[in-house]
Amino acid sequence: MHQTVHRVFGHLFKFCRIAGGTYTPSSGHSLCILKGISLLRGTDEYGPMGNMKENKKSSGTQSIWMGSSVEAASRPLDRSLDTDVCIVGAGIAGLSTAYSLSCEGKSVVVLDDGPIGGGMTERTTAHLSNVIDDGYVTIERLHGKHGARMAADSHTAAIDRIETIVVTERFDCDFERVDGFLFPAPGHPPERLEEERLAALRAGLVGVERIERPAGPVLETGGCLRFPRQAQFHPVKFVTGLAQAIERCGGRIFTDAHVSTVKGGQQARIETRQGHAIVAQSVVVATNTPVNDMVVVHTKQAPYTTYVLGAGVPKDSVPVALYWDQADPYHYVRIQKDAAANGHDLLIVGGEDHKTGQANDGAQRYQRLEHWARKRFPMMEQIEYRWSGQVMEPTDGLALIGRNPDDTSNVYIATGDSGMGMTHGMIAGMLITDLIQERANDWAALYDPSRKSLKSIGTFVQENLNVAAQYADWVSAGDIGSEDQIPKDSGAVLRSGVQKVAVYRDEEGTVHRRSAVCPHLKCIVAWDSIERTWNCPCHGSRFDAYGKVLNGPANSDLSPIET
């Protein structure tokens, strides 16, 4: 464990040295930091949601998108293969890349250990926007005016590309162009909105205007900005359509194929847990967060959990649009037409973000989110969906798309979605295709995973100190004193001698024990009582109640307990 902390601090030191900092990764210094920061985790005894629909895919809650797609002809991998490009991950980033490459004649193999779109793609709220989450004032400060223009251009192009694919391939995925409305945070001076409007215009967005109030809801007083030509769609229907189009172009998609090893070289080699291997000219790892990178990329982004409610509203009572505010954490809202149980529209509201694995108070967060929503949407009916998703937040606000740092030139990654996974995923499809085809791309430097943004060093240091602090859990007591205190369908971390044990009691009362040590970089996992998962507070790895890995960067299950 001590060696792992040093690896994290070693990368912190390298970054600080480049920026002129003075941090020294000495043993005493790192231990002082660990002693000086205490971690408090709340407890949450909130049981299963009254209206929650069971999901056996990626976690314990179910989004509106789950279970609504037509199956593509995916199948388990039963043999080794050669191909031009192997893509690991069948979400929007992986399938967008596979679609573009297969349309250009490349032979493509896609591998995923779950169903198509079964990761974070089915847990998004599917806003398609060129309004950067961190705001253009921040993006311009961190990346300059040219960088802000490239960010605006790439997200605009991503929406246009999605629309073109929908029309060309005739996808039935509820794609619709809508306006977006950005509201100020409570108490923010009105100048903030005007600064953001001017920065957006400098970045090249067209038609951004300040209005006193939209035709629909008012999230906060003080006016708002209207951004035209945003969009929304049904994400699982879209990626299912992509999968079918890929297969029509000769691409092959294999599910239930857990990739255990990714090796670059003159030819890349991708090995699966089942013992098969794919040999490819290039490999793209598009798994939300890379499973082939131990440290470097994970010091440049941080995992956050975000919460979503879906509630019926009378038809046409809320105009179809995207709505956001500038609160911290911010709220985001959209409408899905005719999607409520009674045929009404479904209001989708998200927010209440926190660092993954560092809070277990999901019930309270849902309650706060509901209170916020009902105050602004008094027509809200019964809540029909509650779900959460994981967002990878890069320290400088933009995704990490391109060649994997410290790797061979034929290994590519797409990560750091920053709450804009749908457009960043499509950007990955366009950018990585150009890189593999050896074409110039104006966005390449902006999204380069090896970039160093010195202006974001404060966030970089803060996030990595937060990671280091989590190793204090090694010397802390367990969540409770005895596994007898664990109710059915719940879990807790217990101390057993020098070991930390993740204990889950299933609905029948049977106890299941796994090591609580995350196999990625040895942090201690925490129980998530809403999703019924074990979550790593360092880099966001997630495991089901029985210890099976769901999300990277960990690439293996929680270990059995040694007796």
Where are the predicted features?
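Flavin-dependent oxidoreductases
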Residues: 261-336, 470-474, 478, 484
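N-terminal Rossmann-like FAD-binding beta1-loop-alpha1 element of flavoenzymes
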Residues: 85-110
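Rieske [2Fe-2S] iron-sulfur-binding domain
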Residues: 309, 492-563
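Glycine-rich FAD pyrophosphate-binding loop
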Residues: 103-123
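Helical element adjacent to the flavin cofactor pocket in flavoenzyme catalytic cores
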Residues: 225-274, 281
